[in-house]
Amino acid sequence: MTKISKIIDELNNQQADAAWITTPLNVYYFTGYRSEPHERLFALLIKKDGKQVLFCPKMEVEEVKASSFTGEIVGYLDTENPFSLYPQTINKLLIESEHLTVARQKQLISGFNVNSFGDVDLTIKQLRNIKSEDEISKIRKAAELADKCIEIGVSYLKEGVTEREVVNHIEQTIKQYGVNEMSFDTMVLFGDHAASPHGTPGDRRLKSNEYVLFDLGVIYEHYCSDMTRTIKFGEPNKEAQEIYNIVLEAETSAIQAIKPGIPLKDIDHIARNIISEKGYGEYFPHRLGHGLGLQEHEYQDVSSTNSNLLEAGMVITIEPGIYVPGVAGVRIEDDILVTNEGYEVLTHYEK
């Protein structure tokens, strides 16, 4: 079943006439055309009969025509009202309720004479949750490039270097491999600074005998990677090394349990129980992982409350961590493809 037919099924289920998609990544997912419209309207209308209409600034029309999109294009000037160029009456319209602003909703009511709204967010999330072979190949390449980033960062470590300097070196050097954009702000934290799970790299200087936490990812042809390694620089103290070994055991055990049909919460419990049994449960404050694809964090989450089942074609992260203020912060994260038989680890830098 195609992506569009899934949307049509949802239109029928909710007795709606059309779906209105405005999130740039979701529009790309359905059309193959990516745009960052800023304040301008950029939207895909999918009608119950399968017709697709893309609204975009007129200056982008030729780019859309050169893409894989085969539907109708409504290009508008900044001085024009896009809705006046495609007059419609849509009784019930499905929208991305998590993203559409109140102002845009008012425009839809006026422009398309909408009487009621439904939600198409979950349907799109479920579609994006299962990756195609093409998507998997892009994520695999993004993961390979993330491995290279870690390699670049580790090779640059030296006593006295700052966190910020290591970040800059990674992001500048990886451009030589064709990377134009990181998945998110690269994180490099030294020693006990890594006890802040989302710390900001700064001017802290690297000392001998401490851990260095790298959390980073790259975007390859719109698809993200996201990995974390905690690397020895010298010989950290005994407690820090004990924490590292516990996190590694938790991650390894959780990954080995991955296969279709297993509830996501069970994977979280495996890692969390290991950490708790070793006395560090209170220092593991976040979920075990999340979905990965066009965004570095997407549906579904690997958490203690998610009863949904793992399915072949999902790509998730597994990232247990222990963060003890004044001592150390350790997180290890890999990107995992759920296969028919079990799993494939996509990130490979040594642990």
Curated annotation (Swiss-Prot):
Binds 2 manganese ions per subunit. The keyword Metal-binding applies. Its cofactor is Mn(2+). Keywords: Hydrolase, Manganese, Metal-binding. Mn(2+) 2 binds at D215, D226, E333. SUPFAM superfamilies: Creatinase/aminopeptidase, Creatinase/prolidase N-terminal domain. InterPro entries: Creatin/AminoP/Spt16_N (IPR029149), Creatinase/aminopeptidase-like (IPR036005), Creatinase_N (IPR000587), Pept_M24 (IPR000994), Peptidase_M24B (IPR050659), Peptidase_M24B_aminopep-P_CS (IPR001131). It comes from the Bacteria. Gene3D superfamilies: Creatinase/methionine aminopeptidase superfamily (3.90.230.10), Creatinase/prolidase N-terminal domain (3.40.350.10). Mn(2+) 1 binds at D226, H290, E319, E333. Its EC number is 3.4.-.-. It holds the Pfam family Creatinase_N. Belongs to the peptidase M24B family. This is Uncharacterized peptidase SAB1567.
